[in-house]
Amino acid sequence: MLATFRTGIEKFIQSHAKPVEKYGHQPRLYALTRHIGADLKYDDDVVFAAAWLHDLGVFVGHRPEDPAELASWDHVRYACDCAPQILQDTGFPAEKIPAVLAAISEHQPQDSPTSIDATILRDADILEQLGGIGALRTIAKVGRDTRFSTFTDAVKTLRKNLEALPGQIRLENTKRLAEPRIAALRNFLDAVESESAGALF
């Protein structure tokens, strides 16, 4: 049953993740949760499901395309609304579904997680916004996301992430994992500043 529902969830997300690079976030995120939670007691089934389903609402075909609607779109609520049926269809243990929804609802940096499962997921998601991966994920949105019309928009977000996110990490394992990512993102932004010569646009 374990392999069945995990495979089912992975296949569902792989078929729905659009643009295609959105898919990589899920397996990377889950791998990070395993490193973060290596010496912690938590429910790996809950974290697995939440890691794979938490961003369903940002996929093309699930999010609204109208810019006005998109500006007020709550992708977390959408994921929480859709997740129960997906989990049921894949044979996920019904008694664990509420914990998955709680973890999804508390996974963003501004949230205050109320369980170890949610804390691990939130910390992992912060790591995905730092380092080389964080830079790639943000830059890939330029010209495709209404928030990112230019490289300047992307760099502003990356600088904000570098300044704000490290201090929001909760767990010691995550803090250690964050160190090289923080350094990598800082080096990248320094290089952009020195190479752009005031003409980044």
Protein language model features and the residues they cover:
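His-Asp-centered metal-binding catalytic motifs of divalent-metal-dependent phosphohydrolases/nucleases
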Residues: 44-67, 75, 79, 83, ...
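Divalent metal-dependent phosphate-bond-processing catalytic cores, especially two-metal-ion Mg2+/Mn2+ enzymes
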Residues: 15-42, 53, 109-201
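Short helix-capping and hinge/turn segments at secondary-structure transitions, especially at repeat
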Residues: 58, 84-88, 92, 105-109, ...
